[in-house]
Amino acid sequence: MRTLALSLFILGCHSAAPAGSEAEPDAGPPTVDGGTTCAPGLAGAPCVLDRYDRAQGCDPTAVATLRTELDARAGLGPLWAGGRALFRTAAPIGIAGDWNNWDTTALASSAFCGTDLVIAVGAVPTGLHPYKLVDGAAWSLDPLDPAFAYDDFAGNADGRNSVLDTPDSGLGHLVELDPACSTVLGNCRDVTAYLPPAYDAPENGTRTYPVLFMHDGQNVWDDHDCCFGHTGWEVNVTLDSEIANAKVAPIIVIAAASTTARNNEYGLDEPTMLQFISFQVDQLQPAALAHVRHDGGKLAIAGSSLGGLVAMELAMRHPEIYSAAASLSGAFWPRMDQHTALRDEVPGFGKQALAIYLDHGGDPSDNSDGAADTIEVRDQLVTLGWQRSDSPSCAPGPNALCYDWAPGATHDELAWKARAWRFLEFLFPAQLH
């Protein structure tokens, strides 16, 4: 199981040597207990690289100490500090990335001090660096690194590269979490997450973050090959820009992919939707949150089309879990014939302490992109006590309803990509986090 939450950075204290005694050698970067154990997780990278330097003489105790520190970080990917990166691999193999111009011979792992500990240490500058492991003609992802980036290079059969994102890159990165499986629904789905810039920096080892969950997780990142050629929402790219410009607070985004049962799970069939809602609340979310540094507050939930519908259903049914929902081009028509559509349910849900974002493209006159349906739900919410304002002049809060109409905008990922900044700035303004 990949664990991304174990990043505590506690400065160790080193007392001065007593008068008349011989001074002890420099203990290196700060440690948890004053010299024997590095700070946990990737926050301890400077200390682990110091342990590597100390083991260069192949002293068995120093090598064992290094192994212990690396074992404690198994599955977290390469460690970086001070312009150097340490990679651990299962067997000797080449490591090619953008920092060495994808040279297959520039860096390779090997047995350290004649042991079965296989590592490589090389110079890597600040930045977000894609890389692959290379064995002869075979290029592969690093199975010990959950971080990845999409790659639309035709020669990359994976469609992805592994990633080393240095804490000072100014960029966030994507990570793969454990798949989420449901015995009731009879399926599994991939779960990925966006971790904000400097998430793994030593100084942020104890920092926690607000969390946004998103539906249709395979469509929300910068995968240029997805979504009928429309590219994804590129929420990760948008967040990097919005955070850098101090418009959006650093947040974690967790996105679960939809399955072949998407339509029914997201609201077409009410019994299946209710099963999915229980799965999302009771299984998927707690499992994913265990692997990131959540601030413990209520969650936000977002989606588009049917994903926007089920986001609203989740938030309205579980205000004890969610503080906000965003529905982009929400498909609010399912179950109209049964009089159990969202518009039929909203009066019964009543006013909840939720910030809500609703938008659409198209034209209300012909209900293209669900425009008329969205306006009807918007007006119902206002009647119940939500206070409407129009993007981008929306202030967050438990009574806030932020609305946007993009006239003529189509029902696809390109349109949602163009509007994603609106709900992010509304729900996670930098000045309030």
What are these regions (language model features)?
Residues D359, D363-S365, D369-R378, L384-H433:
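C-terminal catalytic histidine-bearing segment of alpha/beta-hydrolase fold enzymes
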Residues G75-T126, V134-P167, C181-S182:
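Aromatic-rich carbohydrate-binding modules that target alpha-glucans
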Residues V220-T231, A244-S278:
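Cap/lid segment of the alpha/beta-hydrolase catalytic domain
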Residues E203-G217:
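Short beta-strand element of the alpha/beta-hydrolase
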Residues A157-E203:
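N-terminal cap/lid segment of alpha/beta-hydrolase-fold proteins
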Residues M1, A5-P40:
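Ser/Thr-rich, Pro/Gly/Ala-heavy low-complexity intrinsically disordered linkers and tails
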Residues D200-P202, E265-S305:
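Gly/Ser-rich "nucleophile elbow"/oxyanion-hole loop immediately N-terminal to the catalytic nucleophile
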Residues G296-K351:
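Primarily recognizes the serine-hydrolase "nucleophile elbow" in alpha/beta-hydrolase
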